[in-house]
Structure formats: structure tokens, C-alpha cells
A protein has these predicted regions:
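Gly/Ala-rich phosphate-binding loop of Rossmann-like dinucleotide-binding domains
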Residues: 113-116
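Serine-hydrolase catalytic-loop signature spanning alpha/beta hydrolases and amidase-signature enzymes
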Residues: 102-110, 121
């Protein structure tokens, strides 16, 4: 609802939306530029700093009991794009977590145990990434959403709540739009939609255009020895860079086929933009949408974007966060998600959480 957007009042105003997005990212980019991106290579392409973090995700199995939290289990489920890897734990209504690039399900590991106290948490590796099979095609938001719809149905769920970050925002939107009876609530973290604001960020970092370039351009430019350099540049868009488990994320993209799969999600962006614009009015979201932007990146631009495709949008800014909210400010995300996905009528303990209330 527009009344819950903290008076952003930007519906239909692309100029205002662009200023919100560019202003937030430019402020962060200036900070990045002032310090530079220093990368000292360690073993397997990890930096010395990230190597000290241990690469914990690499110890996790493909199937079986999780190591990071023994109440979770890893599994694989069949879809028409191949097997999809997931990590599942907790009890209660199903809450699906969708990661972005360059991450895997591990990007959610700091918030999963708390969310699992009230929900059955299912964190997927997007098709082609992490431990999921690599599809030959179908990296657009609509096809990926259909595959995850198949996955949760085969796991026995007919209703789910969905929370997506970055690339997971695009997939979560298409899932909620195309399967409105299945997705009862949607939370989206720090990405506007293509066709409604995300393209305004293209000039602010070269990685958007590089990742979208046709094969084999990025594949030839970034080889295994370059992965740490490249991804450490990307992770400098964090406001709290030391909070990011860079080593785990870097190692997940050391395999060339995984990198190509990640690029394929970007190569689908023009198709995603057309898909979103084509259905913005005819298939507006009616389920509640929590649109959370990072203070130092997209801010209320996420809510402004979703207001153009959804009826009930609650705009929230994650204080002190850069792009990776779930790793940089996990406590705030947990508190907000528990309110939004929890029972109706529970009051917010602070003003910053007021728009998170169910």
C-alpha cells in the first residue's frame, strides 16, 4: 500500500526513481573509489583476508545433515531443468529463500536458524549455481520461477512464502506473479525490477554489462586466476565488507561452468525486462510485498519499483547496510522478516521496523 511507503510518493515517476537509485549507489561508489580494491591472492584464488574466514560453505555436503546447523538437511529435487539443491530445516509454513549473484544458498546461513524457529526454511541454490544441476537454457526469471514452483510442489508444498535477494528478487517476482495462489507473501531485498529501475544502475558498475555480454566474452576475460580479483571488486559494494564470507562465495564460482551459468542469468535480463513490462498491469501482484532496500544502495528505490507492479507494497530501508543485507545486517533482517512473515497484529518494537508488520 502506498500509505506504507513512508511517503516515498514516487509511483509512475521514473525520474524520481532514478535519482533514488543512482544517488544511493553513487554515494557508495565514491567510498569504494576512494579506498580502491586491494587484492592479495592466496590459495585457490582467495584473498589472504578471505582465506582466514575458512570457506565454511565448502564443508557442507550435497545431501545429508548440514554442518553449519545440525537441524538443517541438504537435498536434491528434480525439475525439468535438472536437479535443484536445497537446504531445509525448521517447522511451520514454508519460507523459501532465493539468493543472488555471486552467491549461493550459503548467503542466507546467518539468518536461517532464527527464521526456522517459526517456519520450514528452504534455501535453494538457483539452477546452475552452487550444487544445482546446470540447465542448457532457461535462465530467465519466468522459466526459473517455473522450475522452483516444480521443486516446492515435489517437496510437498502448495503454499510458500518467498524472500529473494538480488537475482532472487527477479525470480521471486515472477514466481509470485505467475503462481499467485502458491506464493502468499513476497519479500525482496535490494534490487528494483528490470524495466522499472534496475537498468538505471548499469552505468555505475562495469560488471552489469560484462556479465550480460554474449558468450564467450566474460568467460574469456575472467578465468580461474581472476575470480578473486573480480568478485572482490563486486563485494566492495558492501557497506560492511568484512561481514561478507568472500572465500565461500569466491570458491563457489571457481568452476567455469558455474560462472557461465551466472552470466546466463544476466544475459536473460533484456528478456526479463520485456516480461515484466508486458505483465505490469495485467498481472499485478495482490499478495503483500516487503520491499527492503539497503541504506547505502537502492534504499526506497526497491519499493518505488515494486509499486508499479504490485498493490500492497511496504517499503523498508535496512539501516547501515550495503547490498548484501542478509550478511551485513542479519539481525535487522531477522527482526523484519519475523514481523512480515509472522502473525498479523504484532507491533513493531522500533520505528525502523514499522513497515515490516504483517
Amino acid at each position: 500500500m502506498s500509505s506504507r511507503l513512508v511517503d516515498a510518493r514516487v509511483r509512475g515517476s521514473r525520474l524520481t526513481l532514478k535519482r533514488m537509485i543512482v544517488g544511493g549507489i553513487t554515494a557508495l561508489a565514491v567510498t569504494i573509489g576512494s579506498v580502491g580494491v586491494a587484492v592479495a591472492h592466496g590459495e585457490n584464488g582467495a584473498t589472504d583476508a578471505t582465506a582466514a574466514r575458512g570457506g565454511h560453505a565448502q564443508r557442507e555436503p550435497v545431501v545429508g545433515r548440514a554442518i553449519f546447523d545440525r537441524t538443517f538437511r541438504h537435498g536434491l529435487v528434480h525439475t525439468d531443468g535438472g536437479k535443484v539443491h536445497y537446504v531445509k530445516g525448521g517447522s511451520g509454513p514454508a519460507l523459501v529463500l532465493l539468493h543472488g549473484w555471486p552467491e549461493t544458498w550459503w548467503g542466507w546461513h546467518l539468518v536461517m536458524p532464527e527464521l526456522a524457529k517459526t517456519h520450514t526454511v528452504i534455501a535453494f541454490d538457483l539452477p546452475g549455481l552452487g550444487y544445482s544441476a546446470i540447465p542448457r537454457d532457461g535462465y530467465d526469471q519466468k522459466t526459473t520461477a517455473a522450475r522452483l514452483h516444480q521443486a516446492v510442489n515435489r517437496l510437498g508444498y502448495r503454499e510458500v512464502k518467498v524472500m529473494g535477494h538480488d537475482m532472487g528478487v527477479l525470480v521471486g517476482y515472477a514466481w509470485a506473479r505467475d503462481y499467485p495462489r502458491e506464493v502468499t507473501r513476497l519479500a525482496v531485498l535490494d534490487s528494483p525490477l528490470l524495466g522499472f529501475g534496475l537498468e538505471d544502475a548499469y552505468p555505475l558498475s562495469f560488471h552489469f554489462k560484462l556479465n550480460m555480454a554474449p558468450s564467450p566474452v566474460p568467460e574469456k576475460i575472467v578465468d580461474n586466476s581472476d575470480v578473486a580479483t573480480y568478485l572482490n571488486y563486486v563485494f566492495e559494494f558492501a557497506a560492511v565488507p568484512d561481514a561478507i564470507d568472500r572465500d565461500s562465495h569466491i570458491r563457489a564460482y571457481l568452476h567455469p561452468a558455474r560462472r557461465s551459468a551466472g552470466y546466463n542469468y544476466y544475459r536473460a535480463w533484456p528478456e526479463n525486462a520485456e516480461d515484466t513490462k508486458a505483465h505490469a498491469e495485467s498481472k499485478r501482484l495482490t499478495e503483500p510485498v516487503l520491499a527492503m532496500g539497503a541504506e547505502f544502495v537502492f534504499g526506497l528505490g526497491v519499493a518505488a519499483s515494486f509499486e508499479q507492479v504490485a498493490e500492497d507494497v511496504r517499503g523498508v530501508v535496512a539501516p547501515g547496510a550495503g547490498h548484501w543485507i542478509q550478511e551485513e545486517t542479519p539481525e535487522f533482517l531477522i527482526d523484519c522478516a519475523n514481523l512480515f512473515f509472522g502473525p498479523e497484529g504484532v507491533p513493531a518494537p522500533t520505528e525502523s521496523l514499522s513497515s515490516c508488520v504483517a
